[in-house]
A protein has these predicted regions:
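Short beta->alpha junction loops/turns
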Residues: 12, 41-44, 109, 164-167, ...
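Active-site cores that bind ATP or allylic diphosphates and position pyrophosphate for catalysis
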Residues: 62-190, 195-202, 210, 235
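A generic structural motif
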Residues: 9-11, 155, 162, 274
């Protein structure tokens, strides 16, 4: 199979190049290499509009002139009646053309259910009364998330969509778009979100950090990959996997159906293991930048490699390993003394030493 990477950047307010650069750098550091060229959604707006225009022509989509304020009033009225807040479809049969401030909506069926077999959660059915005529193209001409990903997945030949279960509610909407276009559905799988040790939604207070922060904290990339894999997938009782083993053994049937808790201590356990397993020359290369940050700018991989075995058995990350090696370097270095400090703190007897 292929692993394709797509940058979903249609939300221009939340999408910046530095964010994309950080994502790509983090994936490369983790060894998560993708196949083919990167796909940027902002470079495909003509394609999305082509598909949306065809949906309008076929009667599966329509122009809507309702303002956001009018739509909110519809929803408030529905809430007041104890009904599900939704757009009431008043523009469905008006036959409007394009115009300033107008959006394009999907004309969903008026009755029936959307059903699919999730590879993790099993059979899922949603009554169309729970949905409304979702927007496909915003008033600024940009496609919505659900519209863009359906076109992308179809054009990129995506066969399996595996994502967090916070996207389960999007899937019926996307299936309706697939059906309107007459396209074959991919297989959907929704994995549970990772929780903290207290079984609450994972946050920074649980130790969740960005990939760059873990890298700066002296974590090895494969330790992080191994730890994350075990939170969402299993192969018997096996804990440790090489990257090739993960590729060879992965089977969607073994995706966890219940949420797992992230344990920072377990991550350090993985990291300590891979520190001990990493060849000495590779470990010297990895720890060198952390040693140089401590002021030993003349240190080289060759000069510190003999010192690595002295501390790696007890270190949990590269920072701890660098701290241990630095102690030896401090002792062997010809460090200058602060003359003012010597005069202030050392007695005449001490100066003799």
């Amino acid at each position: 199979g292929e692993f394709r990477l797509r940058i979903e950047d249609t939300d221009t307010e939340r999408s910046k190049q530095e964010y994309t650069d950080a994502i790509l750098a983090s994936m490369r550091w983790l060894g998560l290499d993708w196949d083919g060229e990167l796909t940027y959604q902002t470079q495909r707006t003509d394609r999305y509009n082509e598909v949306i225009d065809k949906m309008i022509e076929s009667g599966h989509a329509y122009w809507c002139s309702c303002t956001p304020e009018e739509v909110e009033a519809m929803r408030e009225a529905a809430r007041a009646k104890g009904e599900k807040p939704r757009y009431d479809g008043r523009c469905r049969e008006r036959g409007l053309d394009a115009g300033p401030g107008r959006v394009v909506r999907l004309k969903i069926p008026t009755e029936g259910r959307v059903v699919f077999d999730d590879m993790v959660k099993g059979h899922i059915a949603t009554d169309v009364s729970e949905l409304d005529d979702m927007i496909l193209r915003r008033s600024d001409g940009m496609p919505t998330y659900n519209m863009a990903v359906v076109v992308d997945d179809h054009d990129m030949g995506i066969t399996h969509v595996i994502r967090g279960d916070d996207h389960v509610s999007n899937t019926p909407k996307q299936i309706l778009i697939y059906q309107a276009l007459g396209w074959e559905l991919p297989v959907f799988g929704h994995v549970p979100m990772i929780l903290g040790k207290d079984r609450q939604k994972l946050s920074k207070r649980h130790g969740a950090r960005s990939v760059v922060e873990y890298q700066n904290d002296g974590l090895l990339p494969h330790a992080l990959v191994n730890c994350l894999v075990r939170l969402g997938w299993s192969h018997g009782d096996q804990e440790l996997f090489s990257m090739q083993e993960l590729i060879d053994l992965f089977d969607g049937k073994n995706l966890n159906s219940s949420a797992s808790a992230f344990d920072p201590d377990k991550l350090l356990w993985f990291n300590a293991h891979y520190l001990r397993e990493t060849p000495l020359d590779d470990l010297a290369r990895l720890v060198l930048p952390f040693i140089q940050q401590k002021g030993f700018t003349d240190a080289t991989e060759a000069s510190i490699e003999p010192l690595v075995p002295l501390y790696r058995e007890r270190a949990k990350n590269l920072i701890e390993l660098a701290d241990g090696i630095a102690q030896l370097l401090y002792k062997s270095a010809d460090l200058p003394y602060d003359e003012a400090g010597v005069a202030k703190w050392l007695t005449d007897e001490g100066k003799e030493y």
